[in-house]
Amino acid sequence: MSYLKETPLGRSSEYVDQYMPSLLCPVPRWDAREGLELESATLPFHGSDIWNAYELSWLNEKGKPIVAMCELRVPCTTPNIVESKSLKLYLNSFANTRFQSRDAVRAAIEKDVAQTAGGNIEVLLFSLQESAGFPVWEDRGDCVDNIDLNFEHYEYRPDLLLCDQGPEQTGQLYSHLLRSHCPVTDQPDWATVVVRYTGRAISPASFLRYVVSLRNHQGFHEQIIEQMFVDLMTQCSPRHLTVYGRFTRRGGIDINPFRSNSEQPLPNRRTIRQ
């Protein structure tokens, strides 16, 4: 993946404040999926990458600055993800550009990001007043973080996942301890990860050990969640599986990949760290 060094993440960048769609940079999904032995035509999951951008501003027709929150939903079936720093630079390019309306801004973002991702996407813009009423994600299910264990493995170990013997059940596990690293800058990424499943009971202690083993693992947010989905399917074989990552923001943007073989994307509710 040496080509990633040539993306905006891999080099210093100038900040442009006039609308410039060419700043957007695609990253092929197939690169990481090859390592997981996934074929685009037969993915074992569906879902979306939900992006929240908190630093969007443009000028109205009178030259007055307008600010808004931006939500983007990029289906996991698109051939590309959007390199996150390039999206930040692209959104910054709206700052001193005049637009007729909020919908004109929304339409421009939807068109440009869809072209970069290689498929249809959805964009929503919200005023700060509208955003203020959005609920925060509520903890539901079993949080594994308070299990008292000794830890030795901080390198990727999918074999740590274990299933209890017994009848099929439906459960939800979550952890706020997920940490991984950007494959370009090696900066740490932090997330809450939620797993919902129907199948043999996943051992909460083993799930916690597995989450901790990703602590020094490299991958973009989307790749980490797909890796977790594949590992859980391989090690535990649940009939239904959902993996949802809520990553903390960087550069005014948070990315929240959702992968499932049975559910549609959950509501876009920020966690306490977002």
UniProtKB/Swiss-Prot annotation:
What does the UniProt keyword field contain? Cytoplasm, NADP, Oxidoreductase, Queuosine biosynthesis
Q: Which family does it belong to?
A: Belongs to the GTP cyclohydrolase I family. QueF type 2 subfamily.
Pathway(s) the chain acts in: tRNA modification; tRNA-queuosine biosynthesis
- Give the E.C. number(s): 1.7.1.13
**Is-annotated flag, keyword Cytoplasm?**
yes
> A single GO BP annotation from the record?
tRNA modification
An MF annotation (GO) of this entry = preQ1 synthase activity
Stored InterPro entries: GTP-CH-I_C/QueF, NADPH_dep_7-cyano-7-deazaG_red, QueF, QueF_N, QueF_type2
Instruction: State the protein's purpose.
Output: Catalyzes the NADPH-dependent reduction of 7-cyano-7-deazaguanine (preQ0) to 7-aminomethyl-7-deazaguanine (preQ1).
Q: Does the keyword Cytoplasm apply?
A: yes
**Name of the featured protein:** NADPH-dependent 7-cyano-7-deazaguanine reductase
Compartment(s): Cytoplasm
Pfam families per UniProt:
QueF (PF14489), QueF_N (PF14819)
Query: Which residues does NADPH bind?
Result: S84, K85, R250, G251
Q: Give the main localization category.
A: cytoplasm
The enzyme class is oxidoreductase
Active site per database record: C182, D189
Which PANTHER family does this entry report, sorted A to Z? NADPH-DEPENDENT 7-CYANO-7-DEAZAGUANINE REDUCTASE (PTHR34354:SF1)
